[in-house]
Regions:
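A short acidic, Gly/Pro-enriched loop at the edge of an enzyme's catalytic core
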Residues: 97-98, 134-160, 166-170
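Class I SAM-dependent methyltransferase Rossmann-like catalytic core
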Residues: 2-5, 24-29, 41, 49-97
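Core SAM-dependent methyltransferase catalytic element
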Residues: 189-209
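Short, polar loop motifs at secondary-structure junctions
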Residues: 105-109, 123-131, 185-188
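A short glycine-rich, Lys/Arg-flanked "PGG" loop and its adjoining helix->strand segment in the class I
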Residues: 165-181, 186-187
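Conserved class I S-adenosyl-L-methionine
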Residues: 89-122
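Residues immediately within or flanking Cys/His clusters that coordinate Zn2+
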Residues: 8, 36
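Short cysteine-rich clusters marking metal-coordination/redox-active sites
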Residues: 11-14, 39
């Protein structure tokens, strides 16, 4: 986890948002490899191991047997690697800085997107188990709530495997107003507050009001 992301984290428990407290173990090139983040409100602690912050109650990575929302839709053709440039265009980001949140299988796009969008840090939520952190990618695992503060992301992409209502609501919450919201599902069950821009080729694209 990039050390500066600490300021954007929130405890997933149902209480007011408050900045978490970081206790570092190993830090390498501004990436926290081990340590803890603690909540000053409910006093829960969440471990950081191999650079990954685990907010899950069962302390495991995402698996077929894990709790939380499960896939409800598989697009006719998932976004291929060659379409990273298209995804960049859909996000409509100009200039470096800030965070883009990738949820579920969309985290696989991080390496290709970072090559196209220099200076932006990507935050992967419940990434596929083979994924590892990168200098431009921090990984977080959680049960049902994205462990990020409200309205901090310049863009959000939700993968088909987690394109279900609870995760879409959370992805909407962390997105800044006026920014793009992309889902690998042409007909997602979307929260209110999004303006539809397009829906084709297995993707839904909108903007937060």
């Amino acid at each position: 986890m990039h050390i500066e992301l600490t300021e954007m984290l929130r405890c997933p428990e149902p209480h007011r948002e408050e900045m978490l407290v970081l206790s570092t173990g190993e830090v390498k090139d501004r990436m926290v490899r081990s340590g803890l983040v603690g909540c000053p409100v409910c006093h829960k602690e969440y471990s950081i191991a191999r650079g990954i912050v685990n907010f899950r109650r069962n302390k495991e990575r995402v698996s077929k047997d894990s709790s939380g929302p499960r896939p409800a839709y598989t697009p006719p053709s998932p976004l291929p690697s060659a379409d990273a440039a298209k995804l960049q265009a859909l996000l409509e980001l100009s200039g470096p800085g800030g965070y883009v949140v990738l949820v579920g299988s969309a985290v696989r796009q991080a390496a290709r997107l970072s090559a196209l969008m220099e200076g932006i840090h990507f935050v992967g939520i419940n990434a596929p188990t083979e994924m590892e952190e990168q200098p431009s990618l921090s990984l977080l695992y959680a049960n049902e709530k994205v462990p990020l503060r409200t309205a901090i992301a310049r863009g959000v992409v939700v993968g088909a495997d987690l394109a279900t209502s609870p995760w879409l609501v959370e992805a909407h919450r962390v997105l800044l107003r006026g920014r793009r919201f992309v889902v690998e599902n042409e007909e997602p069950e979307l929260p209110i507050g999004l303006v539809k821009l397009a829906a084709e080729n297995g993707l839904w694209v909108g903007e937060k009001r």
